[in-house]
Structure formats: structure tokens, C-alpha cells
């Protein structure tokens, strides 16, 4: 559960409607893979991830980034039940994929950077704080099965 004031919810939702999920998702996942290269071990089937150019031109990175942000957008509709919303993904990432749950936090932080990059002054410190609450809530929900 994420506790946002009504004005924070409205601001988060308004900004999210401007997000280009495919573009931003590919960028966020790409940045995760470049900045934290050990995360690429979870994406061995994606092919060449040996350089930033390879990562950012990789169609599978872009497609999976879109999938991730589409799921994040669904979570924004269910802020009061993130654990329920992400129960299946938590189980998948824990039991089958064995993803270190710390990576969810890293991706959330990278997403905030991507939003700041694209929205500039519109991405105020107050909006950043609201998105940090949301990404923390999502990463906690995704890590729920690990506990």
C-alpha cells in the first residue's frame, strides 16, 4: 500500500498519462543494464548486452522495458493493493527467475531518473517524492514473496 495524498495521486496520474511507455521503458531497463551491469545475467536470452550501444539498440530490451512500464502503470491504478496486484509477478521473480529483490529498487530509482530527464522542470521535487513513494511501494510488493 502506498500512502499518497489526493493531490499527489492526481499529479502522479497526470504525469503518467504523458509517459511514452515503450520509449521510457526501454530507456529505464537499458539504463539499469548499463549502470548495474550485473543485472544483465537475468537477461541472457536477450543477446548482446556488452555495451551501452548494444543495450540501447536491443529490441528485446525495448520490448521488455515496455512490458515493465505497462505493469507499473497497472500498479498505479491499484495503489491500495500493490501486493495483490503484483502477487503473480513476485512469485515468478522469486521462485522461477530468482531475481535479487534489490534490483526492483534499482529499477525504481532508474525510472525516476528517466522521468526527470524527460519532464525536466515539470518533474518537481514534490512529484519526485510522490514517485519515489510509488516505486518503493512497487518494489516492496514485488519483493513480498521473498519474505
Swiss-Prot record:
CDD domains registered for this protein in UniProt: Hb-beta-like (cd08925)
Domain called Globin: residue spans: 3-147
Family: Belongs to the globin family.
Natural source organism: Bradypus tridactylus
Coiled-coil spans in chain: none
S-nitrosocysteine: residues carrying this PTM: 94
PROSITE patterns recorded: GLOBIN
Modified residues (N-acetylvaline): 2
Molecular function via GO: haptoglobin binding; heme binding; hemoglobin alpha binding; metal ion binding; organic acid binding; oxygen binding; oxygen carrier activity; peroxidase activity
N-terminal signal peptide: none
Function: Involved in oxygen transport from the lung to the various peripheral tissues.
InterPro entries per the UniProt record, alphabetical: Globin, Globin-like_sf, Globin/Proto, Hemoglobin_b, Hemoglobin_oxygen_transport
Gene Ontology annotations of biological process type: hydrogen peroxide catabolic process
Tissue expression per record: Red blood cells.
Superkingdom per UniProt: Eukaryota
UniProt protein name: Hemoglobin subunit beta
Residue numbers bearing the Phosphoserine modification: 45
A GO CC term assigned to this protein in UniProt: haptoglobin-hemoglobin complex
Keywords in alphabetical order: Acetylation, Heme, Iron, Metal-binding, Oxygen transport, Phosphoprotein, S-nitrosylation, Transport
Subunit: Heterotetramer of two alpha chains and two beta chains.
N6-acetyllysine found at: 60, 83, 145
Encoding gene per record: HBB
Annotated positions binding heme b: 64, 93
Amino acid at each position: 500500500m502506498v500512502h499518497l495524498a489526493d493531490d499527489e495521486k492526481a499529479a502522479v496520474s497526470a504525469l503518467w498519462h504523458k509517459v511514452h511507455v515503450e520509449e521510457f521503458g526501454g530507456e529505464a531497463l537499458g539504463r539499469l543494464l548499463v549502470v548495474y551491469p550485473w543485472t544483465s545475467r537475468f537477461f541472457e536470452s536477450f543477446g548482446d548486452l556488452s555495451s551501452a550501444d548494444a543495450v540501447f539498440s536491443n529490441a528485446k530490451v525495448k520490448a521488455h522495458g515496455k512490458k515493465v512500464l505497462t505493469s507499473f502503470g497497472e500498479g498505479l491504478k491499484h495503489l491500495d493493493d500493490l501486493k495483490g496486484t503484483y502477487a503473480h509477478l513476485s512469485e515468478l521473480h522469486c521462485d522461477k527467475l530468482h531475481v535479487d529483490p534489490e534490483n526492483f529498487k534499482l529499477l525504481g530509482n532508474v525510472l525516476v531518473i528517466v522521468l526527470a530527464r524527460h519532464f525536466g522542470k515539470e518533474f518537481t521535487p514534490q512529484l519526485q517524492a510522490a514517485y519515489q513513494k510509488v516505486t518503493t511501494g512497487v518494489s516492496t510488493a514485488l519483493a513480498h514473496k521473498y519474505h
